[in-house]
Amino acid sequence: MNFYEKESVSLYLQELEYIEEIDSGKQHISFLSHPSLGRVLIINGEIQHIEAYQALYHELLLHLPAAFLPRVEKVLILGGGSLFAAYEALKYSTIRTVVLCDYDRAVLDLMGRHYSHAKEVLCDKRFHYVESDGWEFVKQCSERFDLVINDCLSVRNFLL
């Protein structure tokens, strides 16, 4: 059986208005607004988050694998600077710890300025942030987790 791409797939957005733009020293972060898709997060020219698709993506990303576990207490999220995956994880009453490993704290801070869910996550005592490359963190981490979520757009390090 052969699989091939008949047509290239792309998303072209017009009518974007800048809300905030940051050069964090690690990456260029743009936070914009679209009239029908809501807020859009772009990092280094790549779309990372579109508000209109958030529930479809993050609820499945977290709740589907969690449904196969008898009890979820410790969660590791690789990437996830939008904090939506962490927000979904913290909905579980059994959660003791959510560790989010993301490359750039500036993304979390930006989300905290613009989303109430992000403010909640950042203030939750069960939430812990590690500023690191996800692959490097996983290689060095001896801690065990019940659930590991890959909320990274780039998988290049995992392919090496």
Model-derived regions, located:
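N-terminal auxiliary segments of SAM/dcSAM-dependent transferases
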Residues: 1-40
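The AdoMet/dcAdoMet-binding core of the Class I SAM-like
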Residues: 1-4, 24-26, 52-160
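Short, isolated positions in well-ordered beta-strands
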Residues: 29, 48-49
